[in-house]
């Protein structure tokens, strides 16, 4: 019994050490998600204004821009998959990877070749394990992306979108990311990034919001040509921010669950340790009483 008691105490110390780690990770995620949510909210006004400017420029332009022109035959589709660099975030990465697999199957059923572009080490590990070819990948910033990260990705995608099929070009670009709804809910989503579908008309203003009037210098064509790459980068940046907030929320929730489970396990092991200690004490008392009885019996015979 003494050996069993030592084993229980050793397990309790181990679980307590793990609990300290999960609790610390929970607090770190909770503090960082506040900034991540603020970044998502801060990027919305710029994205809305840029959407309106692009829509207005497109409606006043005669430019047949390649980023807004539907191709007659789509041979190759790019899929930008936004995952995480680290684990311990529950089903966050597996959910977005599953959505990516669903999109890939749909595009292949339409006869399109897939060109994967990956964000995050989890997506890279997923593709490497299955020995799948990847066009490009980025990592190291999934929980705190910057606009420069989005611009790097956007520039590569726009460059490949402008290439011919024989040179490795793509005809469509889709983005798979996790949309942040709330601290409890995060949803994997798919958007078609290119060709742009949002420039068919000017976005309607909100209640009480004035519709801006645009004057284009030197021309609507020149403004549209300058705005479209920025618009692509802005949408990618928003997707990365949404994914970062979702990752941190999922990690906080997973670490809180792990901490709660550690508390329950410590209670269970403590109860078992107390039972083992009580059994040891009972056994020792029995041995003492037995020894005293034996001594008393031998003394009475003498």
From Swiss-Prot:
Recorded GO MF terms: ATP binding; proton-transporting ATP synthase activity, rotational mechanism
InterPro entries, A to Z: ATP_synth_F1_ATPase_gsu, ATP_synth_F1_gsu, ATP_synth_F1_gsu_CS
Coiled-coil blocks: none
Family matches, as Gene3D superfamilies: 3.40.1380.10, ATP synthase, gamma subunit, helix hairpin domain
SUPFAM superfamilies, alphabetized: ATP synthase (F1-ATPase), gamma subunit
Keyword Methyltransferase tagged: no
Keyword Ion transport: yes
PROSITE patterns named in the record: ATPASE_GAMMA
Membrane topology: Peripheral membrane protein
Cell compartment(s), UniProt: Cell membrane
Matching Pfam families: ATP-synt
NCBIfam families, alphabetized: ATPsyn_F1gamma (TIGR01146), PRK05621.1-2 (NF004145)
Assembly and oligomerization: F-type ATPases have 2 components, CF(1) - the catalytic core - and CF(0) - the membrane proton channel. CF(1) has five subunits: alpha(3), beta(3), gamma(1), delta(1), epsilon(1). CF(0) has three main subunits: a, b and c.
Protein name in the entry: ATP synthase gamma chain
Organism: Kineococcus radiotolerans (strain ATCC BAA-149 / DSM 14245 / SRS30216)
């Amino acid at each position: 019994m003494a050996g069993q008691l030592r084993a229980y105490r050793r397990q309790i110390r181990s679980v307590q050490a793990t609990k300290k780690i999960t609790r610390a990770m929970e607090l770190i995620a909770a503090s960082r998600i506040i900034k991540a949510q603020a970044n998502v909210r801060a990027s919305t006004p710029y994205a809305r204004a840029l959407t309106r400017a692009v829509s207005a420029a497109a409606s006043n332009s005669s430019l047949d821009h390649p980023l807004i022109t539907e191709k007659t035959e789509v041979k190759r589709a790019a899929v930008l998959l936004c995952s995480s660099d680290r684990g311990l975030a529950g089903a966050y990465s597996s959910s977005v990877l599953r959505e990516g697999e669903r999109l890939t199957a749909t595009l292949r059923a339409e006869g399109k070749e897939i060109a994967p572009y990956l964000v995050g080490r989890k997506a890279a590990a997923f593709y490497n394990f299955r020995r799948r070819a990847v066009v490009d990948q980025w990592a190291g910033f999934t929980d705190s992306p910057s606009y420069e990260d989005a611009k790097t990705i956007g520039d590569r995608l726009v460059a490949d979108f402008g290439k011919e099929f024989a040179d490795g070009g793509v005809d469509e670009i889709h983005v798979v990311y996790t949309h942040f709804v709330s601290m409890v809910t995060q949803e994997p989503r798919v958007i078609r990034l290119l060709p742009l579908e949002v420039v068919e008309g000017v976005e309607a203003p909100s209640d009480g919001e004035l519709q801006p009037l645009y004057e284009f210098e030197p021309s609507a064509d020149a403004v549209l040509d300058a705005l479209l790459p920025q618009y692509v980068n802005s949408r990618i940046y928003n997707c990365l921010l949404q994914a970062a907030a979702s990752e941190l929320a999922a990690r906080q929730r997973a670490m809180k669950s792990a901490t709660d489970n550690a508390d329950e396990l410590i209670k269970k092991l403590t109860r078992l340790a107390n039972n083992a200690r009580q059994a040891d004490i009972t056994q020792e008392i029995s041995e003492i009483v037995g020894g005293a009885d034996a001594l008393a019996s031998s003394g009475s015979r003498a």
